[in-house]
Amino acid sequence: MRFAWLASVLLVVGGILDAATPPRSKKQFINPNGVPKPTGYTQVVTSGPGQMIFLSGQGGAAPDGTMPEDFATQARNTFENIGRCLAVANARFEDIVKINYYVTDMAYTAELRRIRAQYLNQAAPPASTLVQTALGQGLRLEVEVIAIVPE
């Protein structure tokens, strides 16, 4: 009888403690089609409530993985890759709340702004531009993005 009473108390207390624990945010890790497959990381992670989307650094590789030599083509490919990554999380460019640019030469920033304006045509989100002398082989630009999609 004592055992049954103790077991009942433990079940009730366990249920109360379990009910008081807030649910963990739901995370989903995604590697979208049309974006080069990564090794050792994921291209996109989403998290809720109010879906937060974190993109790994996107570069200028074409969907087949080839790397163009010129900066303008790399920049366009980079923003196309960002668009594909956002789309798998039901997000768009206007959902971006933070963006970080890594370039191998500050001389590229004028061209970057011109191409960026074709994709980010709303109020510009907070951004950082950093010179990074050692990106991946042949890479002249890498862009990290955080976006939020309301529930």
Predicted features along the sequence, with ranges:
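N-terminal presequence-like segments and the immediate start of the first folded domain
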Residues: 3-80, 84-97, 103-151
